[in-house]
Amino acid sequence: LTAVLKADAYGXGIGL
């Protein structure tokens, strides 16, 4: 995963 996806996962709760 990219840092952007990780940040989105932590921030939005997607869990990617």
Swiss-Prot record:
Its cofactor is pyridoxal 5'-phosphate. This is Broad specificity amino acid racemase. The keyword Transcription does not apply. The keyword Isomerase applies. Keywords: Isomerase, Pyridoxal phosphate. GO terms for molecular function: isomerase activity. It comes from the Bacteria. It comes from Pseudomonas putida (Arthrobacter siderocapsulatus). It is an enzyme of class 5 (isomerase). Belongs to the alanine racemase family. Its EC number is 5.1.1.-. Signal peptide: none annotated. PROSITE patterns: ALANINE_RACEMASE (PS00395). The modification N6-(pyridoxal phosphate)lysine is found at residue 6. The active site is at 6 (proton acceptor).
